[in-house]
Amino acid sequence: RSSAASDVYKRQFEEMSGIFDARQVDVSALEEDPDGVSDASVDGRNFAVSGGVAKSVENVIREKYPDREIKMANAEGLKECRKLLTMAKAGKYNGYLLEGMACPGGCVAGAGTMQSIKKSQAAVNKYAAQAKHKISSQTEYVKELDKLVD
């Protein structure tokens, strides 16, 4: 929607494709890392649950800057997201990290979900708890990010 375009930052598959093309990354030529998923963090695995992305960002900031104040607000469901954006535009959330998930409960409860939101969230939480690392900045893959920066 053009009315929200300047207020909402998102990344779509088409845009990611453009980024990969610009960086000359051939995704189809990449080899699958069988340990890749097992090296994920609790935070990374919780991205699919409402509040999970913002919590991951918060945890990395707290690790690096423990005294920094972090204000966050999140919404789930389009109605609540719209309300959050309206309040943000009115200045109610200046300096806040905002997270909005279109689906109630987060992506884990998206259109293809075949079980209750609570059951889906519980399954994600159980899977996340088995991760080797708590915070995403503790995984081996963070070191690879420097290669993407000139």
Predicted regions located by residue number:
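Single conserved hydrophobic/aromatic residue that forms the stacking wall/gate
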Residues: 1-5, 9
